[in-house]
């Protein structure tokens, strides 16, 4: 890649002023727009003005553009929308490498007591470590499912929001919760759960404090009780009512394991999908993580209601939870995005890896035609944007959308000679990330974070992990 900054200062490349914006121009690159028509260009241009995409097309950029502050030669590169992560647990970044041979329930029972010791300082470090891995793998927008809030843990959600703002990432945090402890027949220890009313009040406070409904919002909040085996029906129902009264989305875990299926049938007399439906938890404003153990009826209900799915292939394999029926979901019209899940069940935390693993796992179950490279890329971009309710703002490269984009090198020693640049990205080795823009601002350059000190993040993560283990 060559860069011409002769017409302006890189530091002032994006002002966010959409009335008279400076422009970033990328030319001579392959482009996968992931728009509704899957438009691609073998050699094209992308023009960014302020925090919006101004133009995408074949050949060089239009002549006569004013206030071009950065011009990039994208020869040998593929430009795609920034990836969108639909499920994570940032606090787990400081508990990686534990419970390595467990199924979900045993893994949780092992780690709940450890997580009971987290605090806001630890979670700030963990969030930055998690976000660093995401950004360096091409992710521009992420959610996080925070559901452990120890009584003396401080402002955990605020610490996460501050951490991602410092890195420049678009964020959709959730205020999660648990109120069904072991004394009531739930899985988490009582020390990890909250009072139902207190959890709902804290969720309302988080929405009022942090949620931004504007088009280019960098923070939007979601209500997210944890799971059927850690949350009472009262909290699930109350959270749904609260979220809809405030116009925010809903998120939880659903149909992840056979143990969850057995728990729901024994305790509620129905499977997870029917149980959650009975509490108002199906709809276009809802997405659920995993959704592995679903029959045709469950998939049909998700499709009919527009309920979304966060598919987490690496995590599902790590704890041997099963293989989600993603091709069947897509065929039925279910919105599906990709998630890395928490780093305690997916130590790499890289969303780019999930493109490949989603394809491989789908084919393992359904054969070589089960999922294509372009379908995998769509899951990680437009699919994730739809699941998060932001399909009009992000997820594809189209004029008027927000300038969240990734520029991948596909002519290096590991990718040169691969005929199809999308296949190079999805099926090849992890492609070097030359540039990542979030809201029109550079957040990754030449594979490294451009707004923070990576070594400082590493030191803070190490200290936080050691402090937690010492508790």
Task: Report the location of each language-model feature.
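His/Asp/Glu-enriched, well-ordered alpha-helical/loop segment
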Residues: 278-285, 327-412, 427-430
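Active-site microenvironment of metallo-dependent hydrolases
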Residues: 1-44, 48-54, 64-65, 381-471
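Alpha-helical scaffold segments that flank or form the walls of functional sites
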Residues: 96-145, 150-170, 200-215, 462-470
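Histidine/acidic-residue-rich catalytic or RNA/ligand-binding cores of hydrolases
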Residues: 183, 258-270, 298-303, 320-329, ...
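Metal-coordinating catalytic core of metallo-dependent amide/deamination hydrolases
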Residues: 153-291
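Active-site gating loops and adjacent loop-to-helix segments of metal-dependent hydrolytic enzymes
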Residues: 94-125, 152, 180-196, 217, ...
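Glycine-enriched alpha-helix->loop->beta-strand junction motifs that scaffold or abut catalytic
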Residues: 168, 240-248, 281-284, 301-310, ...
